[in-house]
């Protein structure tokens, strides 16, 4: 490498920092050769760095012998260029490029490194599959789309830190290696070499430690932290993910929500120039489930679920009356303009809802010139059909779909159908919509074990007015635990839960009762959470908090289809890294040191 290059590093500028004030000045740039065009005696190179692209013009009459170096340059070679900035001729200006009216007339060129031919082109419109892009992630990062998302991710976390620092929050690190505790998903376990037969668990969240920080008097804590869950992966899941974790002392639910709204308003305006109107709408959990079929509803469009049980209870259609007499419900959604949906499409939708949501069928009526029409309308009185149309707000050209079963199945299936059909028939009216879901139940029945479990986590505080119900349950009285409310809240953006939190239990008695209600007795609780239970007895302040999925938020704000789109080195849906080939086997010696043996089951 020529000495002139290293001596110029301190003067290096970025490709997109050029301006009219730079015209005529000698500049030094380095980066990758993106596009290369040889026009005989003149070679045009699009030099790309992290900021963007600037066109380099290499002329033989200016470079002399150095022109032979330029002729050797190929795609993704690393190069350094020194030259004068010039304005392009009017007919060669590229309005699609940020620097499209400038070009650098090269006076010195150096090849800093060569490159193999990339296995895919690095144009943003390249259709290469995700698998090959994950394998060569370092090449994928050079593409504008991924690069911009990673830059925006940095800016967002920086803005969040800036806001929280201004509000007296302390960024405090919590342990990565801890004991395994039940938090709703499987733990990643790490064997201890020094304590043979014992294991650490990677944290699913810093939940216990951030509560202990409040007991320790830190009052306001945050951390942008890696968390780990060994669970089956979907488009919005990764085995390791990033949370913005927060905890406050001496606050109410409303105090926390107002602070969070101000934080997101600040960060989104600063990074995305997005105006957020606060306070956000608040929706009770039961309304979300009854009207949208989801605890994280997308409220940017209509098609609400409407309970029509009262209107159809006297009809002659056994599917509906049977569901009602069995304690279930009949609900409907109106699809604007949906009468064009074909029978084949309806059959496909029915099969999907049956397979994924256990729906027994999908009844439907089209709204024609004379009202609701279908093969089943003869089983309903004219008054009932008119009442249904009025309840769902249908008009000519619309389609009404019905679900008849238990509330749980109907809500889930029609909620999913609502989301699927909205894409075509009732698209969102606004690009972004934030709202809170509140008033969650504290407990629900686990369908697998048929025992009580928590909806959020076992450290969420019940509502004060329900404390006595827990005490009565402990005393053997008949208590429906599902009637106990939780001081919990979720923040939803565009139908995706981006954050969840609660006021925590700071009373040791209530904490023990909650753990006992979900089947964790005194000895078991001491074994799993002894250090927290002990800490609660030393003057724990009232406190609460929230955690946000940074990956998920970035995906929504940048138009990604998966959180893999906004993570530098993501895992596949099988939990593997295509680039490093993790996970992989380890040497026998390492297993021996850990007192472990691999067996085939």
From Swiss-Prot:
EC number: 6.1.1.12
Positions with a binding annotation for ATP: 229-231, 238, 497, 549-552
Subcellular locations according to the entry: Cytoplasm
GO cellular component: cytoplasm
Main location: cytoplasm
Keyword Transmembrane helix assigned: no
Keywords in alphabetical order: Aminoacyl-tRNA synthetase, ATP-binding, Cytoplasm, Ligase, Nucleotide-binding, Protein biosynthesis
Reactions mediated catalytically: tRNA(Asp) + L-aspartate + ATP = L-aspartyl-tRNA(Asp) + AMP + diphosphate
Assembly behavior: Homodimer.
Family stated for the protein in its record: Belongs to the class-II aminoacyl-tRNA synthetase family. Type 1 subfamily.
HAMAP family recorded: Asp_tRNA_synth_type1 (MF_00044)
Protein name: Aspartate--tRNA ligase
Gene it is expressed from: aspS
